[in-house]
């Protein structure tokens, strides 16, 4: 090339420029953008060059120009590669050409070296063309090259390689030139470097440079001292262009863009513009050839973006899912890894479908089979290329990026390619040839678009391309992702979208979550649903398949995946061992459970966090697969249990990306850290507690522990370890009756018996999941409950990021004593509610009871009570369970209520027991909804009896959990925010049940009587126990205060007197005026209180006038604590009375059950209110504060206020705002949950709620948030409840958000008054059963503190969460006050009803009454 000689003189430049220029035509054809931008200059240059080709050659500038043309040349082709890897490649080719010609490639790379500047300076004469061009700046070529260098960071390798065609040509020509040009600087290094660049860089380019876009240039620069020998380069380059051409699949498309900038730079940097332009033209021509090469390269493998309908298999790691359903994935496509690619989860099969437990396992599976799978799934070149390029670059760079975060995602996605194609389409192709293909088609659109757009900036994404390459490396960085993957992997069971019209099934709760959040109405995820449904049809098989990436192959791969797991987990090969065990013995889930679980579980448990994590992941992965397989194979107890576990696994899996916005727990970064620290710490690093938790979880919580553990692992591998350990242990327990297992054994028995039928149904009803989601199938409900509970737990964990141990450890480990409880609940949730109870008996009898109770098993009276609470809660959450499945990612609303609420209500123990209980509740709800509907009342009674026990047991854990709850409160709040919907729902149910169910009505009337007593007591408590009038006055003033504080209507003060309440009711109505939803809610609460069966109560008499408002007022009064709840609840009830009735019709059994439970818990609440009043007497001076304090919401004033929990809970409508504001990301979950539970556009509660909003926030997120706040406050406030009650003002003022705290507390008190929080005994029972463990946890917990120091001591600890959760489950489930909160939602919109309410209610105290439902 003359260009090179240009350094010496430019004679060569003239000649070669002409040559290059000759290529100019081609170049024109090849590169349109460059031509467009450079056209004028190039034409000028062309004319100049043609007119005086060697005229300027003598000038050093012409050399630079010539070099610049070279640059332009590569730049021209480069445009394709530049933006993207393809561009980079294209560019590289051109760069190489350039380098070889004038050695501009050298300068291009040189700049990276630093030699570029020298060369540039020198090269101004000749080398500058190449060196200067790269350096950027000095000469047009310099700047062009600099631009190119920057662009070519990834493109440089392409320049190098692609330069082979033209570059080689030019290099061969310019070898001498290059040498001439860069004799001192460029040539010596460049020659050797270039040889290296093209030789070593050839491999490096593909493997290293491509994956590492920026590094590519540097290696290029280093190698590209390029002076290297253009000739060797040429030889190499010629070969390389072919190779590189392939590599540069998308060079052409990107080529144009890259060219433009370079071309622009060229004109800008044209020191020797006249010459440079000419030479640029010349060079451009040569580049034209390269462009042709690039085009060829692009055409075969690297064609432009795929057509819209094209089904593309992408291998990628899902880093997180955004709340709007976008998956942030590192995808490898066409041998290029795009790091920030966004995929629409609803339109593509995405990571959640990747059920591989461990990202590592996914990676490894992808490695051994994953890569093959990748190739297999993508029968098209992209797969092969991905396999090849992914392997090569995965090896070099994948281990870097992927090691950090992709290990899990990409391989995992491939591993669970069946279900995870969205993230890793390629892998999914195998699984979803039909559905995956469909999804792929959708995904390719988005993915391709993303890739097209991302490829420019995502050259480095390739790093993640090789999920296998990074199998080992990615593990660390992937730890978070692994959690995600693990979470995703563990949930092979498809989760059906609870949405009535939605048939979508999500392998991942993430998918469901995102789907619910934004795809509720669209079936974009349908492909995934198809895959899922495929999976759902064959839950076990597909679960195994999904979980392990391939049915049997995945099992076989599972071992690799497991192998990857060990990498990720850092666990001993044991992980792989379980992996192979699970893989090999996946079919023998039982046996595997015994072996793998024991081995992995014990190993994991006994091992370190990492060990357990590995084991968990392995266990989870294997267990998921095995569970699913076993479930499929053995749809017996064990299969049922496994199924349950599986479902939780799935939930976890789904939840894992839960972080999506905050991807499953993993996505929750803080959760990852928290769970890693807190979970492991809380859980004794999850190892110690996990071991216990695992035993516990195996007892009854394989699912719960799994979710818990999974939740933690979800957040952190350690957390995952508990989940897996739990799962393993669970399986262990199932397989072997060990001490830990003994609970599980009973759980297993129960599970086998009850869980078996529901979970077997779930297993058998993989499809039933849909029904379950719809609440149609009890078995599905159980399953969904398990999944939701798990996901919820996971989500709770996520929400509980502050105290991962609460979410995972606390549920699992935090409450070691209650851990069995948690496991029990998990088991309960697993569908072995009764068995769960049995399982629970060992360490967590109470919560265990909850699970059992749902099953109607009295095996554990204590356990049964909690179980019943769980069951009742589940019933209340009957819809929520459905939504849970749907919102599973979002906290599955109610699941959050009860399951997460429990776990989250108590930072440590309560979390385990509460969450376990809550989870059990969902299971119960699902499982027992049908049975429980009938036996709901009886069971409720039993539950009431047992609830005190559970309460006591729960309370202790609650205490443990309360501390963690402080920091977990925000999470808890989010989770607990769901509780209000529960209570509200319960109120809705309540109203319906009151009207439809005589028994329930009686119970409710009793509750209301108690509430009346509570109100009286609260009145007394306000002024004196018997100073009702004084209290009324106080409440009136409080009411006014609250009114002043928009949100705090008389609810708080109202408790004293029905009349006051009636006043309160109107006041509340007015307050609801402030809080649009509030007035509605007030009627609802009123409705709840009043309802047909309410009239008998004295409250009812007054309600006669203000019937709903009056009832609401009376309810509000019924417990200033509970009064707020009751108050809001009655309004909500009123509003939801219609909805409730509708729900009753829709789910009459559930509603009757819930209502009876509601009645029970109301009675309990009355009792509790009495207790609270007595306890509140110390708080009497400050009825508000007292109520707030007694409301548990106040307990963790700072936290609750911080979470706006007080607000959220206090104002069911308004509360939505606060929790939403505080936890907007979670709000969608709660929202969706409530919505899922019972979104009736016709229902008054939903009146103001746009259906779309509801769909977006399936569980009435706002209300959920609101609900959670109380839980959180109650949980953390369990201990603070006493303080708050003793010194309400102190509690309130203790937190900067004392207002919110007050609101929360008032909500809690409201719930107390509404739920049997006040009544110590019944209250506990009812709180557990009726008040809702979550609700009870919040308001009961507060009651325990305010109205029941006893309770605070006993109940508030665990019970607050659980009790509150149950009550709230009932209330929220009935009244869906959350939906009323969604009334606020309309104005609060996506934000937070609570936040809006908070602003409306100016003063938090005011918030209390309205929030109270």
Curated annotation (Swiss-Prot):
**Ranges where the record places region Disordered:** 1-26, 47-196, 354-484, 517-659, 695-765, 797-962, 1004-1127, 1154-1221, 1273-1369
- Hey, what tissues is this thing expressed in? Expressed in myoblasts. Expressed in neurons in various brain regions, including striatum, prefrontal cortex, olfactory bulb, midbrain, cerebellum and hippocampus. Expressed in neural stem cells (at protein level). Expressed in thymocytes.
Cross-link Glycyl lysine isopeptide (Lys-Gly) (interchain with G-Cter in SUMO2): where in chain: 479, 788, 1063, 1155, 1299
The induction comment states: Down-regulated by ZNF608. Isoform 2 is up-regulated during neuronal differentiation.
Q: Where is the composition biased (Low complexity)?
A: 386-405
Annotated localization: Nucleus
Stretches annotated zinc finger (C2H2-type): 495-520
Residue numbers bearing the Phosphothreonine modification: 381, 745, 822
- PROSITE patterns linked: ZINC_FINGER_C2H2_1, ZINC_FINGER_C2H2_2
What does this chain do? Transcription factor, which activates RAG1, and possibly RAG2, transcription. Through the regulation of RAG1/2 expression, may regulate thymocyte maturation. Along with NIPBL and the multiprotein complex Integrator, promotes cortical neuron migration during brain development by regulating the transcription of crucial genes in this process. Preferentially binds promoters containing paused RNA polymerase II. Up-regulates the expression of SEMA3A, NRP1, PLXND1 and GABBR2 genes, among others.
- Protein name per the record: Zinc finger protein 609
From what organism does this protein derive? Mus musculus
